[in-house]
């Protein structure tokens, strides 16, 4: 269900940045090496993507010019059922940012990761970047 409101707001149309309560990159990412600045900008665009109930289900493992993207496993299916939509929005944010930075990105599914069983996360895709 999608809800749209019409009319004029009583206060500001925008919430304050502190109210967004986004997780930091350090909470979302595991870095195998220090990432370059353009990689951090791309990850930040993904981090800022809206998600249902602010669930922010994405987790990233960053190595060289690769980002392995995982979905946080949910204790209940209530939030998990929206993950496809949430990830679609996050990928759109990431790809838009990559295009703005003139980066080539291939989204691929790696068999060696998709067949592994991870305790708290589920493998989704990998982003291979070519600056």
Residue ranges and their predicted role:
Residues 1-131:
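Acidic, surface-exposed loops and disordered segments
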């Amino acid at each position: 269900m999608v809800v749209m409101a019409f009319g004029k707001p009583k206060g500001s149309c925008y919430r304050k940045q502190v109210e967004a309560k986004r997780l930091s990159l350090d909470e979302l990412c595991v870095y195998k090496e220090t990432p370059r600045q353009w990689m951090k900008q791309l990850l930040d665009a993904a981090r800022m993507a809206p998600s249902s109930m602010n669930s922010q289900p994405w987790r990233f493992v960053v190595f060289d010019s690769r980002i392995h993207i995982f979905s946080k496993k949910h204790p209940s299916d209530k939030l998990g059922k929206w993950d496809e939509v949430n990830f679609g929005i996050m990928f759109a944010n990431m790809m838009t940012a990559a295009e703005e930075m003139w980066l080539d990105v291939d989204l691929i599914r790696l068999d060696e990761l998709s067949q592994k069983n991870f305790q708290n996360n589920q493998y989704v895709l990998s982003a291979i970047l070519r600056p």
